[in-house]
Amino acid sequence: MYVDFLVPESTAQSILAVVEASLSPEGYQKALAAMRVNHFLGEVCKLPNILNKYSYNFLLFGTPSASATSPWGWLLYGHHLDISCFYKGTQVIMSPSFTGAEPNIIDEGEWKGTKILHKEGSLGWKLMQSLSHEQQQKAQIFKEMRDEGMKQVYGNSNNDETKRDELITDTWGPDDQRHRCGAFRDNRIVPYEGVQVSSFDSSQKELILSICQEFLLYHPTKARQLKLEQIKQHINETYFCWIGGFGEDDAFYFRIQSPVILVEFDHHSGVFLTNKEPAKYHTHTIVRTPNAGDYGQAIREGNEKLE
C-alpha cells in the first residue's frame, strides 16, 4: 500500500483498520513501530519513495467470516515486516511472521523514542547468561557470527541452479545470514541443535516461555495464551541454540525450536547502514510453525484454497 503511488490515504487507513482489528493492541503497536522505523530509515538514507511507513503490500484472501466453512486471511508484507493471518472459524494462525529493524530505535523526528525488538534480544541474552558453562557450550553451535564452519548458500555450486542444495545444508546466506527459516523456506526441515530445554530449571523454562510470548505479540490475547499452552506441553522437547559471543556488547543469534514453534533472532550486518559486521542495531526476527503449520495449512481441509 504505497500511499503516494497506489492507494489513497483513506484506503491505507482502511487496511490498517483490518490489521488493528486482527492483532492484539500491543501487537498492532509493534507493527506500527516496524513501519515507522522503516520510514525513519528512508529519511536517514534519503530514500523516502521506497522506504516509508506505507511501503507494504496487503493481500486479502477469501471473504471475512466467522464460519469454519468459510476460511479467510490476509498477508501484509514489505521491508522488515511480514505478517500472515489465517482464520477458520474461531481458529487463528499468525505464522509465518518476520519483523526487522535497521536501526532498532528512532532518535529524532515525529516518532522519536520508538524502540523495537529490544526485549526479545534482552530476554534471549538473559537466558544464555543464566545457563551453566556446560549448557552454554551445548547451546553455542558456532562461536563466531560468520564462522568458518558455516556452509554458505551457493558455497560449492558456483551459482549453478542445478547444484543448489541450500535447503538442506546451508547455515549462512547473504540475505538471511544465520536464519534457517527465512524467505522461501516454507516447511523446511531444520535439525534440532543446541541444548535441550529438559535440562533447564523452572526459571529458565519460564524464560523460554517469556521469549516465545514476546515473539507471539501479534496474536490476540486468547490465541496467544492457547499457543503458549501448546508450547508448554512440548517444553521438554524444545531446543535452544546460540551463535556468537554472549558478552554484554556481542552481537548474536538464537533459535528456540520445538514440534509446535520455531523462533529466530539475529543481529545482522548493515544493509542501508554502514556496519560490515553484525551489530545490535540491525535485527531480524522470525516466527514459524513447524509440521506444515504456517499459513493455516495444517487445519485446512484437503485441497482447500483461498482466492
Where are these regions (language model features)?
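A cross-kingdom marker for long, charged
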Residues: M1-A12, L16-E307
